[in-house]
């Protein structure tokens, strides 16, 4: 991070964040603004139309400036279909000068939203980093918090990304998930270590009012 920070253009640079507010399911601990993709499938095209229009407008407004970083988050960006992801990335690359970008991240957070076709689309563009986020490698916990995917899917998605040439893969974990103890976290770390991600981000569980757990008073 220090190496990247030293290269930032604090005068003319900026960071570009693009949000995709859809997920395969909404985790019970999550307070982010996101909705289940199945319930909003017929609205995704309308959202994408408005988003691409905004990206073009911001591109014109920022002429003379170059982004230092690009981050596509959410939600889960890979809930978009491959063709929709292609349009999104194409619009970004056409409307911004990316020659100064130090890091271009696409969150591929939910393994159950990752396909070979979507990863192949991402590889077409100057994306330098993806994030595949199991949060835990304990199946009992995944089921409890409503993530609706398996540990095996996490591993399959990770190794598929490696096979397609992704050489900067982050993984996110959450410490303190409901029902987990130190031995569960130790086992999760062991399994992740065996996969050799390029970076690991560990968050402490924080229940906020917007999360289902927060509304239930847990």
Residue ranges of model-derived segments:
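Conserved non-cysteine loop/helix-boundary elements of the Radical SAM core domain that shape
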Residues: 34-218
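N-terminal [4Fe-4S]-dependent radical SAM core
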Residues: 1-16
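Canonical Radical SAM [4Fe-4S] cluster-binding loop centered on the CxxxCxxC motif
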Residues: 13-46
């Amino acid at each position: 991070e220090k190496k990247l920070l030293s290269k930032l253009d604090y005068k003319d640079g900026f960071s570009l964040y693009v949000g995709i507010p859809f997920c395969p399911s909404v985790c019970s601990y999550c307070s982010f603004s996101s909705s289940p993709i199945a319930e909003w499938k017929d609205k995704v095209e309308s959202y994408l139309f408005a988003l691409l229009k905004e990206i073009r407008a911001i591109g014109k407004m920022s002429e003379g400036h170059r982004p230092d970083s690009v981050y596509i988050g959410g939600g889960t960006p890979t809930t978009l279909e491959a063709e929709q992801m292609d349009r999104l990335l194409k619009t970004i690359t056409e409307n911004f000068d990316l020659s100064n970008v130090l890091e271009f991240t696409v969150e591929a957070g939910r393994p159950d939203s990752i396909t070979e076709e979507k990863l192949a689309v991402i590889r077409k563009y100057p994306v330098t980093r993806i994030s595949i986020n199991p949060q835990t490698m304990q199946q009992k916990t995944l089921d409890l918090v409503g993530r609706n995917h398996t540990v095996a899917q996490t591993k399959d998605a990770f190794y598929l990304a490696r096979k397609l040439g992704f050489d900067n893969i982050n993984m996110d974990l959450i410490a303190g998930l409901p029902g987990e103890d130190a031995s569960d976290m130790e086992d999760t770390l062991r399994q992740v270590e065996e996969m050799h991600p390029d970076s690991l981000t560990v968050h402490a569980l924080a229940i906020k009012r917007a999360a289902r757990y927060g509304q239930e008073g847990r």
